[in-house]
A protein has these predicted regions:
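Membrane-embedded transport module
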Residues: 1-112, 133-136
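C-terminal transmembrane module of polytopic membrane proteins
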Residues: 80, 86-173
Length: 173
């Protein structure tokens, strides 16, 4: 959604195609490891309310998208180059994917619990590779440490805001 809105409002796709491919592969690595995670186990069959799940998923996606679009808008309005924005969006999307796993995997706030060793290793590896690619300009435009830190702070603030809203809603279901 963030890329679509970026194109509609700014007349360019705010992420390089190379970065899209890398993002997909890196995100799938965590998805494949999620079965090893240490989460809350129920001993009775789950009864999923698909309409409720869709609302929750849309709300989470909307939160990340609104904050991400605000971030991209700020960068565009304050003179960042399209290349820098592209890499910063890539970093933001990778971090949002890693953080959403942490947010939705537990009944606690994401900073109060930790994933399984394998999920944690894959997430840390994904984030480290993302930072290396962004800082070295491999397969995407190079960004500075300052731009990387700005993006990390935005993603972390977004995760905290989203989780502060998400957890009380989930506890009252």
């Amino acid at each position: 959604m963030l890329l679509t809105f970026g194109y509609l409002f700014f007349n360019y796709i705010p992420m390089a195609l190379n970065a899209m491919v890398i993002y997909t592969v890196m995100n799938n690595m965590v998805t494949m490891m999620i079965g090893t995670d240490r989460t809350h186990i129920t001993y009775k069959p789950e009864n999923w309310n698909m309409a409720r799940l869709a609302k929750i998923a849309f709300s989470l996606a909307a939160g990340w998208t609104i904050i991400g679009f605000t971030f991209v808008s700020y960068l565009n309005l304050h003179g960042w180059s399209h290349n820098s924005i592209s890499t910063m969006v890539y970093v933001y999307l990778v971090l949002s994917a890693m953080l959403i796993v942490l947010i939705t995997r537990t009944r606690k706030y994401f900073w109060q619990d930790y994933p399984s060793k394998l999920v944690g290793i894959v997430q840390i590896t994904d984030v480290a590779l993302t930072f290396i690619l962004a800082l070295c300009g491999l397969a995407m435009a190079q960004i500075s440490w300052q731009n990387l830190l700005i993006t990390v702070v935005v993603a972390l603030v977004a995760a905290v805001i989203i989780d502060l809203i998400y957890q009380p809603v989930m506890k009252n279901r």
